[in-house]
Amino acid sequence: SSTETPPSYNQLNYNENLLRFFNSKPVTAPVELDPPKVESSYVSSARGEDARSTLSPVQGFEGSGGSGSSGNFTTGSNLHMSSVTNTSNAGTGTSGTGNSGDGGGGGGADGTGSGAAPPVTLTESLLNKHNDEMEKFMLKKHRESRGRSGEKNKKSANEAMKMLEYSGPGPGHGHGIKRGGSHSWEGEANKPKQQLTLNTSGGGGGGGGGGGMPLFLDMTHASSSSQNKGLAGVGVGGAGGVVGGGSGTGLGGNGNVGSGNGNNNQPSTNQYTQSRLPCTQNINLWPPFSVGITTPTSVLSSHTAVPPSSFSPQHSLFPTFYYIPASIAASSPSGTNTNPNRPHKHAHVHNSSEKPSTSQAAAATMPLQYMTGVMYPHPSLFYTHPAAAAATAMV
């Protein structure tokens, strides 16, 4: 960015100055290993080493580069720096740099070189030119490195923005992020309830009543063509789809499950309509009531058939089913008990001529098949099924 203050040349060149200083191999050997010289040369060389150790190359370049921060250094510091930077070419000739601050330190690089090429005399103009070139080079490197890192940051920022655009709801959505997926189920919340009220095929999922019958079933129009299809046939004229379906897959040989229930215009051959029972009212079966109803066969039609004097054409409630042993139910029409030792389920005895309640009429209009090993719910406070009443009366 153009608003930032660019780093100075000395900051950028600090590491290179350190490397160049240690690669120049400054003389740090003890006195015994130096070549024999005059005593004054030993002292001057020692002073030169001390001055070189206190003056870093960075400070030398600041004084020669004209940055203004170290203007107190004179050309002696330039000569001192020439001796530091050129010792690799001129051997160990640093004997003339004893007084580096007096401005007159002569013979800076005329040491005892071992046949090397004479070094170029460093002037302030050459050092300034070198510093300018190196500063441009270092600033260029700095900008390139900053540019690469800036491009990486921009790419990562763009990718993050794209991810937010893909995952966010967008400007056209009215919901927030938390409600982003709620539209998929808000409209479907009432669908199971509507299916219960409109198409109540309970247990078999629409199999019992051939796709489900309406809530109000006219039992006089219920077709009995599916009643003689076996023990596990389809529902009683479509009532199987409403009350629970029983086993609506048709195990008794009925190839088409809904064949007998789909047409309600067939003439009724129900066993109660054959016996001239007044069962013309509609039965209102509520959808939440789920009781498995199985169809009776023609063999067991005499078990549940009760004389029509015990029925009253009243509006019905839900039928409650009792457990009736098959032997007692079979012996009820003939009046003979084939199994006298078997205890009867009901302790209370109702007179068959007693006028039944409205629930008895509902139970009478729903033809039932009582299995021998199945317990049916029987609250004894309400009533006894007419077949049970007849069976207990015959006993």
Curated annotation (Swiss-Prot):
Subcellular location: Nucleus; Cytoplasm, Perinuclear region
UniProt superkingdom: Eukaryota
InterPro entries, alphabetized: Period_circadian_regulator
Gene Ontology molecular functions: transcription cis-regulatory region binding; transcription corepressor binding
N-terminal signal peptide: none
Protein name: Period circadian protein
Gene transcribed to yield this protein: per
Post-translational modifications: Phosphorylated with a circadian rhythmicity, probably by the double-time protein (dbt). Phosphorylation could be implicated in the stability of per monomer and in the formation of heterodimer per-tim.
